[in-house]
A protein has these predicted regions:
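Sec-dependent signal peptide recognition
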Residues: 2-8
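C-terminal motif of bacterial Sec signal peptides marking the signal peptidase cleavage site
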Residues: 15-16
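Histidine-rich, glycine-flanked metal-binding segment
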Residues: 24-32, 40-85, 100
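Hydrophobic residues on conserved beta-strands that form the core of alpha/beta folds
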Residues: 35-36, 60, 271, 363
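Divalent metal-binding pocket/active-site signature
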Residues: 200-258
Length: 379
C-alpha cells in the first residue's frame, strides 16, 4: 500500500445553499466540468472568493474568475460554496465499506477521506484477533484475508471504495496482539514487540499512532508504553492522536499525559473530539484551551478536532468500568453475572449517574434485534 497523500482539492466538489444546481452540457469543450460563480474555500483557511473551477479528467485544471474555456458539463454554483472534500478524522466506516464501498452516507455529505484508527485499527491481527472479529463485525467476509494494516487497506481498495482511506495504527490493536486483555504493565520484551508492529504499520503507510484511553484494554497501557510506541511513529514523521484518558473530572490531567507523550516522543499530537463531558465539568474547557495554546507557544505541535454539539455517543464499553472488562468479552460477561462482583459494579455505575442522569442517555442501537425492538428510543 502506498502512503496516503492529502491533496489540496478533491475533484469531487460539493455546493451548498440550494438543493440543486443548474447544469448545461456542451459537446466541444476545453474541460470536462466547469463549476461557475461559486464561492471557493480552498482549504487554506483564507476567506472565500468568487471563481470558476475547471476540471479535466480527475484533476482540477484551472481556478479563476470568469474562465473562458467551456466545460462538457457547466454547473452554475451562484450563491453556493465550492470546497475541497471533507476529511472524516475519526471514521469507523471500515466494516461498512467492506459491505458497500459506495459510501453514500458520507460521500453525499462531502466526505472524501476516511481516517481509521481511533485506538483500534484493521490490523495488525493475530489468529485469535481474527476469530474474535469474525464473531463480531467483519463485513460480509467469511474470512479475514489480511494480517497487517497495509494489507487491510489494500484489501478494501481492491474491493472498491469511493472515498480515499488512511489509518492510524491502533495502540489498542497492538496491545491486544502482544499483551491480550490483561490489566498489567507491558514487559520490556512486549514493548519491543509492539514497537516492531508499529514500525511495520508505518512502513506500510500508517499516518501515526491512535489511542482511545477510556476503553479497555487501552486503559491498561501506561504513559511510558505510549511514549515508546510514539517514538517509533516519530521516526516516520507520524502523529500521536488520542481519545484522552478522561474527558470529565480528570480532563486536565489527561491532557497533561498527551502533552508529555508529545514532548518525550518528539511527535505532533492531536486530541480527538476536544470537549469537557458532563455539565459540571464544562468550565474546564477554557483551562484546557489555555494549556494547548501555551504548549503551541512553546513549540509543540498540538492540535485538536471538535464536533459542534453538546452530546456524545458510545457503547457499553465506554460505560462499564474497565476493571470489569479485564480478560476480554467472556470474562466481562461472567464478571457481570457474579453475585460477589455485581454490588461493586452497581455502586460504580450509580456514582456515574450522579453527574450523568439517566434521562440524558438515549438508547439508539442493539446487536440483539429483540432488545432493539423493545428499547431503542428509550432513555
Amino acid at each position: 500500500m502506498k502512503r496516503t497523500t492529502l491533496l489540496l482539492f478533491s475533484t469531487l466538489f460539493f455546493w451548498s445553499c440550494s438543493p440543486t444546481a443548474n447544469t448545461a452540457v456542451n459537446i466541444n469543450s476545453a474541460y470536462d466540468v466547469v463549476v461557475r460563480n461559486g464561492t471557493v474555500y480552498d482549504g487554506s483557511g483564507s476567506e472565500g472568493f468568487i471563481a470558476d473551477v475547471a476540471i479535466s479528467g480527475d484533476r482540477i485544471a484551472k481556478i479563476g474568475p470568469k474562465l473562458s474555456g467551456k466545460g462538457k458539463k457547466e454547473i452554475d454554483a451562484t450563491g453556493m460554496a465550492i470546497t475541497p472534500g471533507f476529511i472524516n478524522m475519526l471514521s469507523w466506516a471500515f466494516n461498512s465499506l467492506l459491505r458497500d464501498g459506495l459510501s453514500q452516507s458520507d460521500i453525499r455529505q462531502g466526505v472524501t477521506l476516511e481516517v481509521f484508527g481511533e485506538g483500534n485499527s484493521p490490523g495488525p491481527l493475530s489468529d485469535a484477533m481474527k476469530s474474535e472479529m469474525l464473531g463480531w463485525n467483519s463485513g460480509d467476509d467469511s474470512e479475514i484475508p489480511w494480517v497487517t494494516l497495509g494489507e487491510a487497506l489494500t484489501h478494501l481498495e481492491n474491493k472498491g471504495v469511493s472515498t480515499n482511506v488512511a489509518s492510524f495504527v491502533g495502540a489498542t490493536t497492538v496491545r491486544i496482539h502482544v499483551v491480550g486483555y490483561e490489566n498489567r504493565k507491558a514487559t520490556p520484551e512486549e514493548i519491543s514487540e509492539m514497537q516492531a508492529l508499529v514500525r511495520e504499520a508505518m512502513e506500510e503507510g500508517a499516518v501515526g499512532l491512535g489511542s482511545s484511553l477510556i476503553y479497555a484494554p487501552a486503559d491498561y497501557a501506561d504513559t511510558d508504553e505510549l511514549i515508546s510506541l510514539s517514538k517509533v511513529v516519530g521516526e516516520y514523521g507520524g502523529r500521536y492522536i488520542s481519545h484522552m484518558r478522561s474527558e470529565d473530572k480528570d480532563l486536565l490531567k489527561a491532557y497533561g499525559e498527551l502533552e508529555r507523550i508529545a514532548r518525550e516522543a518528539g511527535v505532533g499530537a492531536e486530541i480527538y473530539h476536544l470537549k469537557a463531558s458532563r455539565e459540571p465539568y464544562w468550565k474546564l474547557l477554557d483551562d484546557l484551551i489555555d494549556l494547548v495554546d501555551k504548549a503551541r507557544e512553546d513549540g509543540l505541535d498540538i492540535s485538536a478536532d471538535m464536533y459542534t454539539y453538546n452530546a456524545s455517543s458510545t457503547g457499553l464499553t465506554g460505560v462499564i468500568p474497565t476493571w470489569v472488562q479485564e480478560g476480554g468479552h467472556e470474562a466481562w460477561m461472567a464478571r457481570m453475572q457474579d453475585p460477589v462482583v455485581r454490588p461493586r459494579l452497581m455502586k460504580d455505575l450509580e456514582a456515574e449517574l450522579v453527574v450523568q442522569p439517566p434521562e440524558g442517555i438515549l438508547l439508539v442501537g442493539f446487536r440483539n434485534e429483540k432488545m432493539g425492538e423493545k428499547y431503542v428510543g428509550m432513555t
